[in-house]
């Protein structure tokens, strides 16, 4: 005897090996009075509340003999509870084989997969459950049992399960007149027809069986579900699906008739029969369920949701374009012989560019085949199939209700939950026809499932055709009717869902709103054509596509596609143009590189020749120069890019020597001077046209110095005081004294050599001259040694006698602060001053009144006389420009230098033809005055831009000497440049003075260098910080 442990011995089988029920009927005719039920114990199985009556009606008809043929009844669809572990997700298949033969006995054995085990189990079962004529020792009868057909019952969740009574006994109803004679040792109780009424079904239970451990231990409950095949046909059935549905318990009723059946019919229990799929070949992509386009171009939006969205107004062109796509899809499906089952908005999704895709599964489609013969259609006359194909399903819907209503029902997750049957029938002619049934998908019916939302039920009702509501099969004309409903809903706009429901109810009676008729007269008539009550009067999809309403719809998506293609073409052309330009640029660059390489090789040869002409250096010179040469080489490598730019710029100028003579005709202003010696020196310096030689000369001067060293420090008692900011520094004619002036309202004269005396703790000025307001600038007279000019914040220009410490003259014609004052080196009696009153005034030391005034459009920040010409004056302005005037013509500037991005704070002459300017845009610019133009901006006159220091808001000082340039920085540093190269030679960082210890520390505390001044007879520069500290720095 088998116990519960035998469950583990039950092997799994796949779909191909599905168990089947085979039997051969006896020669005895089937009559209701021949039905007897052998039982050991009797159980009354009550019908559940809400169970359908149709199941019992079918059974009653069957018992009354109204339907002949083979009958296999699956009683019950109720899910059963089990003591099995419900968390087990594995599939366990248990098979019970019932063997029967004529005039013999009925035996139940185990799995037929093993012949030896089959014999052993059979003998054990017959010994435990002896039947009539099958007593121990009747081997011949046992052999007949094996040789005859077998009845195999597949225990599979969702297909069939054999329930047990409350005491664990297996319930089997045997409807076989001949088999009853072989059942012995049991009580014979015939079952009347009334026993199968709506009140209950009586069953007889076998005695204790080891197989009971394989089945549900619960009293059988449920209804009979009958399949009636056509008479005199041979039938086969096989499993079709592997999908899962809820398991249900069933009692098996086997009825044999007088007709001989050569083959067996395997059985499976269903929650409800599905729609009949198509026998035709698989349709094209437009109807193929594999091409549902889910997530294509994004998840998309359901057309139903799109219709429910708050549309401000109906875009007819957009809606008609959507409608045409759906018609195209339906036409494609109809051309493949497929009728769309769910042709309604919820079955479509709308994507970008209003592209519409059909997204329902393939089981929700039906096919129509005009070539289906009448005999095949007669198979569908079976009541069960006919009900399934109609608009209601009395079997499937209550079955689902039972699943959701039963409080104690549980499923067996280890079993598969869906099934299918493929019925092959063979007529007397030998023709074989095949029907496929699937239960893997919900039935598509006009009566919605309990799990369907109310809106979905309403949508199904709205889009169902009149013939579908009457119970007829769905056809291609039904899809046309649904298209008419869809067209009306697309072109309509509803205030609320209640208004939508009312309008959709009216359209079924062909009632259109007046607003719809007035706005869409042509579409309204077209819509009524599609909604014709008679299906034969409705158009086909081909007629719809060829109609004036649909055929004239612009292909918006195609237009968008064409625009996209045009855009791609434009982008492609643009990319091609870019690549051509890049290629041309690279080729040009390659040509320039070849020219530059040739120039470098030519210059190398020239340098080698010059060195050979000079002669080899002596051993002492070579040994002395080698250790020091490493430092300049490192600096050159660090600045190689800037050096290359300057070198090739010099090469370009060397190849255009005639450009030097394309100069303005009044360039004599640059040399108009009474200082003949200076003019001769300058002519000797610039008489050569060797620009490359000039570059090499500048490179040597740049590499000559590498750093600043401190040579002297001016120590005063007023350090770290903001009132000590020094705005201007200047050496006298002999450079023995220098003057300082600033916010302290004092002009102080210091002896230069005294700064080198380190034994002095505090340096006092040689002379000190007070002023009424803050001082902005000072300038020594280059001819009269003791004359000093100053400018202050009151706009007063004063002439001081340094010997006496008194002011000689006051020039008070400026209306605002005077920023700068300068003496002319060529004419020592002339001086000029610039002011915030946007004017430059010319003075003479022998006269009180102004000699002349230059009016400017912006504030004047600095003034500077040319060192060679007594008539050339330059000044910087806050309008980012530098102006040069011929003092013989004050009405218009001689040239305007434009290139800075901020105010020009300083302007200094390097020589009579070169000017350097400083600006608060962090740059210095070198201007070649020979390249300027008259009456316009001279943007091409800038020959070099220096950068590296910081100057954004303060006056930091500017000074020049023999081609070297010094300036301050807002980082509290002093920078040194040479005119030939744009990068700094070196810089020096000022430190702040500790007020307690008096020592210098690294912190700058937002200090900046406020003024610098070269001592031209040496490579020294005096610089001042904004805290009043003054240092003498020397380039080494």
UniProtKB/Swiss-Prot annotation:
GO cellular component: Cul4-RING E3 ubiquitin ligase complex; nucleus
Gene from which the chain derives: SPA2
Superkingdom field: Eukaryota
Keyword Repeat: yes
Subunit details: Interacts with CO and COP1.
Record comment regarding domains: The protein kinase domain is predicted to be catalytically inactive. The DWD box is required for interaction with DDB1A.
SUPFAM superfamilies, alphabetized: Protein kinase-like (PK-like), WD40 repeat-like
Chief place where the protein resides: nucleus
SMART domains (alphabetical): WD40 (SM00320)
Domain Protein kinase: 200-550
InterPro entries (UniProt xref): G-protein_beta_WD-40_rep, Kinase-like_dom_sf, Prot_kinase_dom, SPA1/2/3/4, WD40/YVTN_repeat-like_dom_sf, WD40_repeat_CS, WD40_repeat_dom_sf, WD40_rpt
GO MF annotations in UniProt: ATP binding; protein kinase activity
Induction: Not induced by red, far-red or blue light.
WD repeats mapped onto the chain: 721-760, 770-810, 813-855, 857-895, 899-937, 948-987, 1004-1036
Pfam families: WD40
BP GO terms, sorted: photomorphogenesis; red, far-red light phototransduction
Motif (DWD box): 915-930
Its biological purpose: Involved in suppression of photomorphogenesis in dark-grown seedlings. Probably part of the COP1/SPA E3 ubiquitin-protein ligase complex.
Coiled-coil portions: 587-611
Name of protein: Protein SPA1-RELATED 2
């Amino acid at each position: 005897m088998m116990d519960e442990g035998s469950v583990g011995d039950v092997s799994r089988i796949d779909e191909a090996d599905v168990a089947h029920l085979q039997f051969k009927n006896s020669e005895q005719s089937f009559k209701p009075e021949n039905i007897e039920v052998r039982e050991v114990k009797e159980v009354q199985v009550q019908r559940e509340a809400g169970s359908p009556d149709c199941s019992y009606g079918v059974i009653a008809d069957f018992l009354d003999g109204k339907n002949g043929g083979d009958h296999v009844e699956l009683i019950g669809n109720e899910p059963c509870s089990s003591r099995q572990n419900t968390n087990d997700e594995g599939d366990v298949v248990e098979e019970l084989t019932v063997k029967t033969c004529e005039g013999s006995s009925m035996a139940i054995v185990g799995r037929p997969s093993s012949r030896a085990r089959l014999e052993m189990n059979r003998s054990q079962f017959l010994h435990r459950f002896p039947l009539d004529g099958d007593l121990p020792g009747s081997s011949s009868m046992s052999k007949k049992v094996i040789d005859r057909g077998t009845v195999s019952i597949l225990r599979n969740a969702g297909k069939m399960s054999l329930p047990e009574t409350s005491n664990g006994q297996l319930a089997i109803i045997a409807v076989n007149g001949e088999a009853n004679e072989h059942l012995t040792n049991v009580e014979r109780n015939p079952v009347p027809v009334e026993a199968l009424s709506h009140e209950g079904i009586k069953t007889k239970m076998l005695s204790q069986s080891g197989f009971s451990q394989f089945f549900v231990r619960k009293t059988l409950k449920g209804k009979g579900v009958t399949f009636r095949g056509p008479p005199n046909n041979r039938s086969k059935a096989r499993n079709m699906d592997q999908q899962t549905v809820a398991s249900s318990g069933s009692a098996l009723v086997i009825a044999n008739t007088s007709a001989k059946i050569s083959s067996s019919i395997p059985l499976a229990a269903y929650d409800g029969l599905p729609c009949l799929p198509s026998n035709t070949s698989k349709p094209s992509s437009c109807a193929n369920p594999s091409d549902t386009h889910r997530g294509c171009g994004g998840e998309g939006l359901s057309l139903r949701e799109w219709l429910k969205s708050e549309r401000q107004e109906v875009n007819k062109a957009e809606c008609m374009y959507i409608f045409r796509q759906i018609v195209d899809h339906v036409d494609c499906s109809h051309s493949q012989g497929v009728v769309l089952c769910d042709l309604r908005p919820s079955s479509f999704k709308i994507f970008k560019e209003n592209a519409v895709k059909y997204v329902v599964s393939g089981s929700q489609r039906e096919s129509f085949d005009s070539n289906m013969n009448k005999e095949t259609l007669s198979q569908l006359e079976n009541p069960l199939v006919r009900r399934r194909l109609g608009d209601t399903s009395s079997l499937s819907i209550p079955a689902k209700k039972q699943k959701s209503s039963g409080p104690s029902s549980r499923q067996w997750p280890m079993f598969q939950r869906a099934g299918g049957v493929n019925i092959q029938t063979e007529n007397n002619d030998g023709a074989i026809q095949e029907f496929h049934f699937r239960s893997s998908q919900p039935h598509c019916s006009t009566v919605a499932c309990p799990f369907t939302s109310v809106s979905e039920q309403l949508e199904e009702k709205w889009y169902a055709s009149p013939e579908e509501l009457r119970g007829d099969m769905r056809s291609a004309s039904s899809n046309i009717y649904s298209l008419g409903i869809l067209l009306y809903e697309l072109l309509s706009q509803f205030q609320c869902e209640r208004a939508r429901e009312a309008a959709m109810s009216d359209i079924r009676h062909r009632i259109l709103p007046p607003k719809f008729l007035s706005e869409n007269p042509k579409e309204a008539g077209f819509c009524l054509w599609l909604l014709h009550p008679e299906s034969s009067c409705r158009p086909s999809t081909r007629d719809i596509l060829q109609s004036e309403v649909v055929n004239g719809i612009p292909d918006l998506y195609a237009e968008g596609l064409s625009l996209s293609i045009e855009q791609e073409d434009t982008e492609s052309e643009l990319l091609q143009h870019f690549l051509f330009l890049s290629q041309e640029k690279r080729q040009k660059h390659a040509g320039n590189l070849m020219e530059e390489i040739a120039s470098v090789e030519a210059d190398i040869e020239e340098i080698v020749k010059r060195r050979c002409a000079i002669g080899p250096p002596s051993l002492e010179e070579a040994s002395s120069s080698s250790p020091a040469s490493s430092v300049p080489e490192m600096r050159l490598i660090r600045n190689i890019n800037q050096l290359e730019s300057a070198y090739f710029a010099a090469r370009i100028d060397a190849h255009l020597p005639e450009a030097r003579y394309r100069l303005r005709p009044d360039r004599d202003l640059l040399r108009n001077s009474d200082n003949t010696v200076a003019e001769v020196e300058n002519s000797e310096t610039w008489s050569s046209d060797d620009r490359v030689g000039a570059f090499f000369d500048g490179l040597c001067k740049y590499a000559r110095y590498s750093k600043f060293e401190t040579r002297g420090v001016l120590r005063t008692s007023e350090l770290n005081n903001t009132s000590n900011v020094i705005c201007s520094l200047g050496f006298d004619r002999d450079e023995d004294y220098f003057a300082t002036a600033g916010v302290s309202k004092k002009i102080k004269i210091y002896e230069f050599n005294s700064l080198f005396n380190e034994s002095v703790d505090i340096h006092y000025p040689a002379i000190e001259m007070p002023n009424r307001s803050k001082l902005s600038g000072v300038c020594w007279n280059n001819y009269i040694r003791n004359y000093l000019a100053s400018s202050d914040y009151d706009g007063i220009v004063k002439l001081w006698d340094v010997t006496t410490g008194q002011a000689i003259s006051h020039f008070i014609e400026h209306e605002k602060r005077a920023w700068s004052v300068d003496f002319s080196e060529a004419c020592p009696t002339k001086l000029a001053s610039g002011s915030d009153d946007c004017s430059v005034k010319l003075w003479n030391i022998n006269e009180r009144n102004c000699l002349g005034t230059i009016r400017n459009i912006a504030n004047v920040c600095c003034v500077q006389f040319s060192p060679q010409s007594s008539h050339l004056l330059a000044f910087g302005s806050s309008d980012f420009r530098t102006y040069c005037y011929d003092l013989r013509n004050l009405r218009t500037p001689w040239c305007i230098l434009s290139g800075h991005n901020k105010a020009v704070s300083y302007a200094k002459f390097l020589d009579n033809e070169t000017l350097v300017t400083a600006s608060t845009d962090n740059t210095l610019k070198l201007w070649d005055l020979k390249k300027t133009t008259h009456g316009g901006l001279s943007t091409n006159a800038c020959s070099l831009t220096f950068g590296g220091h910081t100057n954004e808001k303060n006056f930091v000082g500017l000074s020049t000497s023999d081609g070297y340039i010094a300036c301050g920085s807002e980082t509290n540093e002093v920078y040194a440049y040479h005119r030939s190269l744009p990068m700094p030679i070196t810089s020096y960082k000022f430190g702040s003075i500790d007020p307690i210890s008096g020592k210098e520390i690294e912190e700058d505390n937002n200090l900046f260098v406020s003024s610098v001044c070269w001592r031209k007879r040496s490579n020294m520069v005096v610089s001042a910080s904004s805290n009043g500290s003054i240092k003498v720095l020397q380039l080494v």
